[in-house]
């Protein structure tokens, strides 16, 4: 999700998956725990959450990485702090491949959620959509005898569906923001970058209001405020460099 590749540490976990190098920065584990540590959760629930986040973000980034490799580049995956990164050094740039690469991450998560739903059905448990409770996760399923398994399955669905949808919002540097930037820059090379940053600011600001005022989710609201501020700063830097009306 975020763009800057963190420096290596001696506490990194390194491995390869399908020929793609993967590095897990220690801050990944810390921030994943912090996301639920403030809630009244049992230690086993925290463990289920960490495992679900690790699997889901890894699959998301591998979705990007497989398409990067398909287009002839050499990807590497880094999991760190608040997300992950499929890093590579592009040797050419075209709109459609970049859009496909950006969409491949959320698509991989949706596919994983579909596999989880299929596994629920295969185990003889019912699944339905609660249209009156779309947030944070509209899919409901019959509980398993094991509470831990039920928690893990719920976490997997929430992460891969909810985070996947939010990640497609036109907010840079989310995947949806990268897609909107590619489209707007293609339609208007002179102003596309600036327009995409403005879209990011308004979308992030609107989502912050919705998350806090309508859904009461302070942490999500803070994240969207940070996105709005970051894009505002990028817009100011863009105007300073290339000229344009400041805000």
What do these predicted ranges mean?
Residues 1-247:
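Hydrophobic transmembrane alpha-helices and their immediate loop junctions
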């Amino acid at each position: 999700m975020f763009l800057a590749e963190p420096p290596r540490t001696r506490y990194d976990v390194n491995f390869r998956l399908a020929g793609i190098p993967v590095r897990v920065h220690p801050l990944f584990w810390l921030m994943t725990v912090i996301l639920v540590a403030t809630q009244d959760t049992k230690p086993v629930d925290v463990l289920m959450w960490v495992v679900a986040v690790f699997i889901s973000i890894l699959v998301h980034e591998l979705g990007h990485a497989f398409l990067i490799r398909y287009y002839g580049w050499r990807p590497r995956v880094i999991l760190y702090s608040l997300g992950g990164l499929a890093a590579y050094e592009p040797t050419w740039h075209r709109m459609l491949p970049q859009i496909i690469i950006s969409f491949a991450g959320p698509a991989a998560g949706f596919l994983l959620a579909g596999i989880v739903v299929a596994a629920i059905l295969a185990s003889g448990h019912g699944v339905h959509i609660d249209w009156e409770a779309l947030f944070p996760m509209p899919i409901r399923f019959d509980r398993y005898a094991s509470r831990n398994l039920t928690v893990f399955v719920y976490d997997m669905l929430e992460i891969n569906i909810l985070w996947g949808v939010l990640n497609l919002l036109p907010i840079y540097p989310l995947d949806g923001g990268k897609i909107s930037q590619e489209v707007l820059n293609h339609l208007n090379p002179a102003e596309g970058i600036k327009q995409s940053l403005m879209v990011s600011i308004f979308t992030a600001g609107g989502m912050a209001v919705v998350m806090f005022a309508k859904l009461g989710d302070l942490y999500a609201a803070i994240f969207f405020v940070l996105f709005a501020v970051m894009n505002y700063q990028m817009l100011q830097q863009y105007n300073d460099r290339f000229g344009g009306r400041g805000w």
